[in-house]
Amino acid sequence: MKGIFLFTTLVIMAFCLFVPNSRAHFQGLIPSDDMVTKSDSKTISLDVIFLHPFEGLYMNMAKPAKFGVMVRGKKTDLLETLREKKIGEFSAWQANYTVKTPGDHIFYVEPKPYWEQAEDCFIVHYAKVVVNSLGVEVGWDEEVGLKTEIVPLTRPYGLWTGNVFQGIVKVNGKPIPGTEVEVEYYNRDGKVEAPADPMVTQVVKTDANGVFTYAVPKAGWWTFAALSLDEEKMKHKGEKKPVEIGAVLWVKVHDMK
């Protein structure tokens, strides 16, 4: 029976996570900047969107289940600061936040489950982004405690083009070896064209310790997403369906001038 259960689970996972020709979904959590300096405005904006970053395609997003910031281990609920915005016909969310203390600010979002008809499963991506305040580099590698998350090993801000980025993928606080991590460039203005489909989404795998590595080739916003199958299912029209959970992290890369 254990063998049958394992086989069934693997089949469901393969169908839900690796449907041929399906575009990669990413939960967006993109601030107006990754570093707030003494001369900058202390108020930043954050876009909370559900999208295909490279292709510039968006999907409707309901108001998140959770949205907050963690500074030096202390969490603040920011859910009620979100306001709905439209990107074309699609619903997205935006918030303003005023930085009051030095140190790293870890913003995080847990969206409500998104039903993906094409993949016959729900999608829940837990996204994070780190914004540095006033040059005090404290807290960027702290864990928020999300169901699944990427814990950076490389400081996730102040990155130059060509820097190597590393992170650990965790589910329920435990590293996940041998899992795929999808990587995409946020092609905001659509100027970058991929000569072939495999170049839209880059893919790397975690090692035996759950660590992945990627050398970032271009300035701009990049996102990493490690996908897993949740142990629990959700009902859709009375039938239990699998849930794809994703650990998502956004980083900004700068050209050296």
Task: For every predicted segment, state its role.
Residues 24-45, 120-179, 185-190, 236-257:
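Beta-strand-rich domain onsets/edges
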Residues 55, 112-119, 230-236:
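Short acidic/polar inter-strand loop motif in beta-rich domains
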Residues 18-24:
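Sec/Tat signal peptide C-region and signal peptidase I cleavage site
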Residues 24-81:
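Start-of-domain marker
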Residues 84-95, 208-211:
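Aromatic sugar-binding surface patches on proteins
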